[in-house]
From Swiss-Prot:
It is an enzyme of class 2 (transferase). It catalyses: 2 acetyl-CoA = acetoacetyl-CoA + CoA. The keyword ATP-binding does not apply. Signal peptide: none annotated. Homotetramer. Changing residue 286 to K: 3-fold increase in thiolase activity, prevents disulfide bond formation under oxidized condition and results in the loss of regulatory mechanism based on redox-switch modulation. The active site is at residues 88, 348, 378. Changing residue 153 to Y: 3-fold increase in thiolase activity, prevents disulfide bond formation under oxidized condition and results in the loss of regulatory mechanism based on redox-switch modulation. Coiled coil: none annotated. This is Acetyl-CoA acetyltransferase. Its main location: cytoplasm.
């Protein structure tokens, strides 16, 4: 079976909710990332066999957002494209799917990744088609309904984090300490330029000229444990999950060029990392945040590795509670986890997050000369996904 490698890995900066990227459609963010990924891989647009992009909040975005992004990026019309929705795992699943397609011999070069603009999610008028007879009407927030709401238990994702905090006995203090560490690491990473090689600037044209967005907006520099402790529970009256120890609502695109090793050699491309294995798992939706535990175990078993062998770990921080539960039970060395901060600080643009953490992992492995890496996320509805990489 073919060996699969990552030829390039790029992302846009992560925009805060309603801030700099709020008027940039997800497909435009995706197109920007695709262009840069192709350029950095050193390949021609016509070398690409397929485009697979994750996107969750698709209402009002138009047919097949991945195809739109491909067109806007200037790829040839003959290249097919597919949009994947595996909620928070979408962007990572596109990469494992690309690897599977390449291993099967059906393609040699695939653009994979994810894109999301949560700021642009519309409100839905579900009964408008056949007319409101009289009285008040209700608008439904598509961002909440399609992205952040447990369809099985009829409650917010935040409650699933509360469930984990209770079941695993994870205190408010532990969650806040974890969140603070994420903020501090992200602040240091941004100030020291750790993300410069992975971020492609987004240029926004306006009446007053151009605005360039090239720095993550979500981190709160100067965060303190005292400040986090003052925040009230966000989802449950006596709960422990707050806006400070949960991830944000964000806008971003992240894209990777995935290739067979033989094609990379043929084209003279120097790969960044090899995709070793991937895992996927389902769990009780009420504790969806625990999904990475099983997905990681599956990927580790396939690779024949142990957790101790991992040099770097990108474990998406949907909530501090679920991140801690997974880390404790998998016995992660916390010095290896999210070394440049995670989603609590950087943000969680749901359809893009899987690709975003993988892009960040690839670059961190290069900078730190780390041999083995893991990227994993929990998924709303009760799932987990994971990918293992080896530096080339």
């Amino acid at each position: 079976m073919k060996e699969v490698v990552i030829a390039s890995a790029v992302r846009t900066a992560i925009g805060s909710y309603g801030k700099s990227l709020k008027d940039v459609p997800a497909v435009d963010l995706g197109a920007t990332a695709i262009k840069e990924a192709v350029k950095k891989a050193g390949i021609k647009p016509e070398d690409v066999n397929e485009v697979i992009l994750g996107n969750v909040l698709q209402a009002g975005l138009g047919q097949n957002p991945a195809r739109q992004a491909s067109f806007k990026a200037g790829l040839p019309v003959e290249i097919p494209a597919m949009t994947i929705n595996k909620v928070c795992g979408s962007g990572l699943r596109t990469v494992s799917l690309a690897a599977q397609i390449i291993k099967a011999g059906d393609a040699d070069v695939i653009i994979a990744g994810g894109m999301e603009n949560m700021s642009r999610a519309p409100y839905l008028a579900n009964n408008a088609r056949w007319g409101y007879r009289m009285g008040n009407a209700k608008f439904v927030d598509e961002m909440i309904t399609d992205g952040l709401w447990d369809a099985f238990n009829d409650y917010h994702m935040g409650i699933t984090a509360e469930n984990i905090a209770e079941r695993w006995n994870i205190s408010r203090e532990e969650q806040d300490e974890f969140a603070l560490a994420s903020q501090k690491k992200a602040e240091e990473a941004i100030k020291s330029g750790q993300f410069k090689d992975e971020i492609v600037p987004v240029v926004i044209k306006g009446r007053k000229g151009e605005t360039v967005v090239d720095t993550d907006e979500h981190p709160r520099f100067g965060s303190t444990i005292e400040g986090l402790a003052k925040l009230k529970p966000a989802f449950k009256k006596d709960g422990t999950v707050t806006a400070g120890n949960a991830s944000g609502l964000n806008d971003c695109a992240a894209v990777l060029v995935i290739m067979s090793a033989e094609k990379a050699k043929e084209l003279g491309v120097k790969p960044l990392a090899k995709i070793v294995s991937y895992g996927s798992a389902g769990v009780d939706p009420a504790i969806m945040g625990y999904g990475p535990f099983y997905a990681t175990k599956a990927a580790i078993e396939k690779a024949g590795w142990t957790v101790d062998e991992l040099d770097l770990i990108e474990s998406n921080e949907a909530f501090a509670a679920q991140s801690l539960a997974v880390a404790k039970d998998l016995k992660f060395d916390m010095n290896k986890v999210n070394v440049n901060g995670g989603a609590i600080a950087l943000g969680h643009p749901i359809g893009a997050s899987g690709a975003r953490i993988l892009v960040t992992l690839v670059h961190a492995m290069q900078k730190r000369d780390a041999k083995k890496g893991l990227a994993t996320l929990c998924i709303g509805g009760g799932q987990g996904t994971a990918i293992l990489l080896e530096k080339c």
